[in-house]
């Protein structure tokens, strides 16, 4: 079944312009949403806890800021863009006591609603607007008169206005200039988590580290291994990003293309696919989210342990040394702090 797509001509910007919007959180997405909503003629306030380091930045950029509870009380549309693991507490403490009949609660990701970590009252519209790009790109494209494609979804719609409101919001941050795709909280959440775990973060990271280990254990210099399995990965991903797998294969040498066809299926085989299916099942049945919640309730001890273990891999030592030679590479905060 083809996805439903919407564009500026399908959206009524006046809907969101007639509402008061609170954006809770001012990270990557929060700043892009807030500034673009304001520039689209929407009345916006940003919700940040007292003492937040981002408060000065908000006021410097000409936006009003108050506590999450106060902006939730003021608004009739609340966009919750705090980290996933903080959202349930913010909802219970700051948002739920201030919700009124007819309010709308929006999210940039469906995890907390789909897995029942947040249970909103039945008289509130529950929607999602999820740009498919980082906040700095969302904002830059908006300023340039363009946009980043967005997903929208409605999980609860007591007044029958959810889709029109979500589409209007997406248009106000530039999404409808590029295209807005209708989905569900379930599909957005499960596909997003699977992509992160099996391919983008977990899968790619382990592939790179294992490739590095194989070469170093075979006697090759760590510096050569780093260049071949990590540094050059960006070149390949950029080609795929621009034109798909076909563009990448067209652009590399015949030797690389031929070798990739022969050896790729030996690395990622039917057993790998079965394990990826198991990962998807753990996401779908809530196994992963239960472990995520247990980690948070345990003070992030499991996550901190995994971070420490990962940081000690030899590829990190080699990489830092080589990046010192690369004047064109922006140094990450982990190496400049």
Curated annotation (Swiss-Prot):
Q: Which InterPro entries match?
A: 6-PGluconate_DH-like_C_sf (IPR008927), KARI (IPR013023), KARI_C (IPR000506), KARI_N (IPR013116), KARI_prok (IPR014359), NAD(P)-bd_dom_sf (IPR036291)
- Does the keyword Metal-binding belong to this entry? yes
Keywords attached to this entry: Amino-acid biosynthesis, Branched-chain amino acid biosynthesis, Magnesium, Metal-binding, NADP, Oxidoreductase
> Where on this chain does Mg(2+) 1 bind?
192, 196
Domain of life of the source: Bacteria
Q: Which PROSITE patterns match?
A: KARI_C, KARI_N
Pathway in which this enzyme or protein is active: Amino-acid biosynthesis; L-isoleucine biosynthesis; L-isoleucine from 2-oxobutanoate: step 2/4; Amino-acid biosynthesis; L-valine biosynthesis; L-valine from pyruvate: step 2/4
Gene3D superfamilies, sorted: 6.10.240.10, NAD(P)-binding Rossmann-like Domain
Write out the catalysed reaction: (2R)-2,3-dihydroxy-3-methylbutanoate + NADP(+) = (2S)-2-acetolactate + NADPH + H(+); (2R,3R)-2,3-dihydroxy-3-methylpentanoate + NADP(+) = (S)-2-ethyl-2-hydroxy-3-oxobutanoate + NADPH + H(+)
Q: Where does substrate bind?
A: 253
From which residue to which does the signal peptide run?
none
* Gene Ontology molecular function: any one: ketol-acid reductoisomerase activity
The UniProt note on the cofactor reads as follows:
Binds 2 magnesium ions per subunit.
- Report residues binding Mg(2+) 2: 192, 228, 232
EC supergroup of this enzyme: oxidoreductase
Residues involved in NADP(+) binding: 26-29, 49, 52, 54, 84-87, 135
The cofactor(s) it depends on are: Mg(2+)
Locate the KARI N-terminal Rossmann domain: which residues? 3-183
**What's a GO cellular component annotated to this UniProt protein?**
cytosol
One biological-process term from Gene Ontology? isoleucine biosynthetic process
Q: What does this protein do?
A: Involved in the biosynthesis of branched-chain amino acids (BCAA). Catalyzes an alkyl-migration followed by a ketol-acid reduction of (S)-2-acetolactate (S2AL) to yield (R)-2,3-dihydroxy-isovalerate. In the isomerase reaction, S2AL is rearranged via a Mg-dependent methyl migration to produce 3-hydroxy-3-methyl-2-ketobutyrate (HMKB). In the reductase reaction, this 2-ketoacid undergoes a metal-dependent reduction by NADPH to yield (R)-2,3-dihydroxy-isovalerate.
Report the sequence similarity comment from the record. Belongs to the ketol-acid reductoisomerase family.
- Which protein are we looking at? Ketol-acid reductoisomerase (NADP(+))
Organism annotation: Mycolicibacterium gilvum (strain PYR-GCK)
- Origin organism lineage: Bacteria, Bacillati, Actinomycetota, Actinomycetes, Mycobacteriales
């Amino acid at each position: 079944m083809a996805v439903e797509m919407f564009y500026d001509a399908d959206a009524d910007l006046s809907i969101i312009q007639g509402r008061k919007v609170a954006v809770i959180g001012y990270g990557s997405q929060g700043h892009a949403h807030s500034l673009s909503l304001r520039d689209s003629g929407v009345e916006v306030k940003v919700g940040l806890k007292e003492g937040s380091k981002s408060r000065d930045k908000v006021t410097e950029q000409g936006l009003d800021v108050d506590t999450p509870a106060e902006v939730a009380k003021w608004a009739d549309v609340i966009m919750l863009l705090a980290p996933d693991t903080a959202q349930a507490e913010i909802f219970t403490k700051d948002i739920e006591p201030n919700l009124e009949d007819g309010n709308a609660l929006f999210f940039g990701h469906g995890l907390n609603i789909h897995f029942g970590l947040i249970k909103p009252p039945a008289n509130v519209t529950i929607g999602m607007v999820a740009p498919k790009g980082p906040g700095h790109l969302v904002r830059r494209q908006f300023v340039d008169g363009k946009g980043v494609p967005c997903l929208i979804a409605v999980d609860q719609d007591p007044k029958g206005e959810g889709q029109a409101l979500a589409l209007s919001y997406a248009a106000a941050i530039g999404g409808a200039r590029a295209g807005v795709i209708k989905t569900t909280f379930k599909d957005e959440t499960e596909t997003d988590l699977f992509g992160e775990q099996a391919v983008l973060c977990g899968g790619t990271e382990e592939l790179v580290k294992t490739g590095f280990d194989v070469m170093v254990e075979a006697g090759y210099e760590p510096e050569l291994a780093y260049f071949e399995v990590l540094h050059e990965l960006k070149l390949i991903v950029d080609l795929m990003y621009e034109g798909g797998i076909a563009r990448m294969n067209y652009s590399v040498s015949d030797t690389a293309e031929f070798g990739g066809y022969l050896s790729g299926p030996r690395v990622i085989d039917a057993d790998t696919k079965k394990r990826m299916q198991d990962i998807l099942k753990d996401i779908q049945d809530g196994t992963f989210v239960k472990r995520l919640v247990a980690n948070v309730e345990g003070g992030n001890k499991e996550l901190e342990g995994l971070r420490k273990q990962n940081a000690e891999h030899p590829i990190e030592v080699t990489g830092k040394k080589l990046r010192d030679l690369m004047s064109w590479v922006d140094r990450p905060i982990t190496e400049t702090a």
